[in-house]
Amino acid sequence: AAAMLAAPSQASQATGTKRPCEEMSTSAGSDAAEVELGPKPEKAYKSSDFLNSKGARMIRMMCELQQPGTVLEEHGVDNVIMFFGSARAKPRAQYEQAVRDAEAKAAADPSDTRAQGALARLQKQAFLIPMFDVVQELAKMTTEWSMRRAAQGKVAYSVGTGGGPGMMEAANKGAMLAGGKSIGFGISLPFEDHLNPYVTPDLAFEFHYFFTRKFWMSYKCMGLVVAPGGLGTCDELFEVITLMQTGKIRRSLPVILIGKQFWKSAINWDFFVQTGMISDEDANQLIFADTAQEAFDALVAGVTALECTPVASKKKA
């Protein structure tokens, strides 16, 4: 039997012919030598097409949740005083120039209702001018105070904003005038294509998702200053005080509202209490201020009190 099994192999060797399996092996090797290798596939995490696709949305969200924390940690930022307020506010000289331009445009074509409306809106915003100055001065005072504390080895605080123009720019500029750094948590919007120039470049962020931006504006927040603003400002304000009310933020942050008349008129806090929608405690946590000094005193008292509480000393979850 062994001889019979061996015979075909011996026969093929004798005749010089190849078995089918040998022919396939030789053919495959020849083809591989002739075919050029294609480009090396791109790794998924390096693929711009994939990372910007619908399928990678969760990955983009995770990036916006993780990257800011890494950057802030690298720069030693752990306690932030957040400033919210209208992007429409302007310093006096800029406001007056904007009014002159709007007046000229409206006068050139009295039938242009859009131009007339733009002028009317600008004129209504004149009350923001002194508050712009208050916010800028308050941010400057806060930064100077924090820098003195840092030099003494005490807890330091950084000014943070939404990174845009208006009241946000006022706060970032105030911090810069004091010689300090400040944060800008920007958001990509069709009518704002860059952050204001006073944000510290290393602490400038641009978010795509509002919820990740709002997370970082509240996560390291140890005090809140809110200047007059519209829907966006109110959204940010209510986000923070709701997190406090529900215990998601486990510390009683000082909440300073700049412009008592504006905030008392815009939101009827007393009516909320009278109808049982919020408690006296909820309303009483709001501090109204009209001057930078008044706001500064309340802010310092609030944040230093937090330093003495057990919750403030715990690592945030």
Which sequence ranges carry the predicted segments?
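Universal eukaryotic N-terminal targeting presequences
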Residues: A1-S27
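Glycine-rich beta-alpha loop segments
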Residues: E23-F185
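Solvent-exposed alpha-helices and their adjacent loops that cap or buttress functional pockets
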Residues: E73-G76, R149-K154, M176, N196-V199, ...
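Short, solvent-exposed amphipathic alpha-helical segments in soluble enzyme
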Residues: A98-R100, M176-L177, E239-M244, F271-Q274, ...
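Phosphate/pyrophosphate-binding betaalpha-module
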Residues: S158-A227, F238, W263
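Glycine-rich phosphate/pyrophosphate-binding loop at beta-loop-alpha junctions
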Residues: M176-G179, G186-P201, Q245-I249, L253-S279
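Active-site/ligand-binding-proximal alpha/beta "capping" segment
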Residues: H208-L257, E307
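C-terminal functional extensions of proteins
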Residues: L257-A317
